[in-house]
Amino acid sequence: MHGDPQQLELLRVARIGRAQGLKGEVTVRLYTDDPEWRFEPDSVLYSQDGETEYIVEGSRTFKDRWILKLEGVDDRNAAEALNGVELYGEADDAEDMLEADEWYPKDLIGLEARLVEGNGLGLPAGQVVGKVVDVVDSPAQSLLKIRLTEPVVTGQNSKGEDVVEKTALVPFVEALVPDIDLEEQYLTLDPPGGLIPGL
């Protein structure tokens, strides 16, 4: 047993998609940056309420997708019945994650977004761009939604009214978001020109 599910702190790991083949395998959309560990054989995943356990029997990748085989799901019909189910895993200890320089998407919300030293825009290091207000899932990668410190007029609409951009979406990849400091509550950005309005 893994303890009272109501006492577990659960984090969304994946959403089950379509069945793969005839033997009960399912494709999954990832919400974790550590699928190798989450999907090890005998790993336990949970429904959102923690009441239902899903035990990983095996996992593999195929064309950049992860495919899971869960215990008790042995044919295509059973696999198709799980389409849309979201899988949750136990959250790691926060202190251990800080030491390992790891974080969950929810940890990024509220962080100040600053320009990295030596950024490609040639602007001062530490210049505050805004604050992270959301982490948006997209098919390619997660996006950081940043509320800009200063709204930017980017043009005019057909009525001659100013178009004001108050937020920017930045792909959450290391090249654009090189540093994250949860203790100091900021992250750094190295955006190309045109990605963030006004820069």
UniProtKB/Swiss-Prot annotation:
Q: Which UniProt keywords apply?
A: Chaperone, Cytoplasm, Ribosome biogenesis, rRNA processing
Q: Which GO terms describe its cellular component?
A: cytoplasm; ribosome
Every PRC barrel domain range:
100-195
**Per its UniProt record, what Pfam families does this chain match?**
PRC_RimM (PF24986), RimM (PF01782)
GO terms classed as biological process: ribosomal small subunit biogenesis; rRNA processing
Give the main location: cytoplasm
Function summary = An accessory protein needed during the final step in the assembly of 30S ribosomal subunit, possibly for assembly of the head region. Essential for efficient processing of 16S rRNA. May be needed both before and after RbfA during the maturation of 16S rRNA. It has affinity for free ribosomal 30S subunits but not for 70S ribosomes.
Q: Which NCBIfam families does the annotation name?
A: 16S_RimM (TIGR02273)
Complex formation: Binds ribosomal protein uS19.
Q: Which PANTHER family match?
A: RIBOSOME MATURATION FACTOR RIMM
Designated name of the protein:
Ribosome maturation factor RimM
* Gene from which this protein is expressed: rimM
